[in-house]
Amino acid sequence: MVRYISDYDLQDVDTEVFKCITDESNRQNSQLQLIASENFVSKAVLQAQGSIFTNKYAEGYPGKRYYCGCHFADIIENIAIERLCKLFGCKFANVQPHSGSQANQGVFAALLKPGDTVIGMSLDCGGHLTHGSAPSISGKWFNAVQYQVDRDTGMIDMDAIEKLALSHNPSLIIAGSSSYPRTIDFKRFREIADKVGAYLLADIAHYAGLVAAGEFPSPIEYAHVITSTTHKTLRGPRGAVIMTNHEDIYKKIQSSIFPGMQGGPLMHVIAARAVAFGEALKPEFKDYAKQIIKNSKTLVKVFQERGLNVVTGGTDSHMVVVDLRPKSVTGKDAVLALERLGIICNKNAIPFDPEKPFVTSGLRFGSAAETSRGLQEPEFEKIGHMVCDVIDSLKTTDDVRLSIEQDVIRRVKELTDTFKV
């Protein structure tokens, strides 16, 4: 009998790919991960995502598939939906979107017509590409109007947003961001939306784990529809979800995702999401979320003590954004220097940034991944000082900079050797 599938392990079948995966594992273990949109998933999540469900095509929804053999696919998707609804206190949910961008596009397809007016946060002030940015479909297919933050405080100006809404009469208002570290007044957003007859979309991609744990305001009472990724503070596999308490909106979203935006769902990823949602329902996840915020506030404290300008003056979440202009350093130069020494973050635009997007005047840090690893305030205090040492070294002599870099490499290794992924 001839079989055309292999029973051999990856390391025996494809040494090139196996080496790349091994190298990436070593990189994650040996560096400090401070990118706000990344996290470390559990072994159980990895096992579910690498499961036999990767073989199954399950086009459609539970109980209404286009293919046979979907009994267990239905069970696993229903588990994911039930756990998600319990986690966020919502009535309806779609767990099939492949990404946060597709989740947002699915909402647009469900609720808007091309040319409708959409109000969202501008990219440089902390918004996401899908919130109406010009290069995105959201900026090309719709009349996108962007709100900004207050120039002096860096905070969302709700009065300015209300004036914008009254002036432009949008069909949809988006509350949410990708680099705004403060709480969001979802109640006020809904009041503004009601004044102009608009839908309110809350994009909580960055804050979802904190919302689920009660450490960040929940939009469930106010938003018509909520989107989120599942791989940031929620600590699940990559992908996204859509939630609502409105059955009429739910039905529109179901058809906009399938067959509107996607074909077959990724059942192995949905299985992994179900595991992650189950983990987030456990009491210890609340402790994890609390520690995330303690750690980010520790970074803020150190940065401010060392003379870094923290955008908005602080944080209420996992994110910290710093303005490097007072240091006469660009985000690009700083992030490359940090990466060389094993500290991974991202260059980031600051509000009204004069620099180009691939240069930027700022950095964005996130505490979720290293909190998953077990680091707490004492370790984040050390990280904060290392970051400041590296930034300050960029304006010193070569000899001084080399000495600082060697010291930071040693201190990074001490932390990563102690706290394994």
Curated annotation (Swiss-Prot):
Subcellular localization: Cytoplasm
E.C. number: 2.1.2.1
Cofactor(s), names only, from the UniProt record: pyridoxal 5'-phosphate
Modification type N6-(pyridoxal phosphate)lysine: residues: 232
CC terms in the record's Gene Ontology section: cytosol
PANTHER family per record: SERINE HYDROXYMETHYLTRANSFERASE, SERINE HYDROXYMETHYLTRANSFERASE 1
Name this protein carries in UniProt: Serine hydroxymethyltransferase
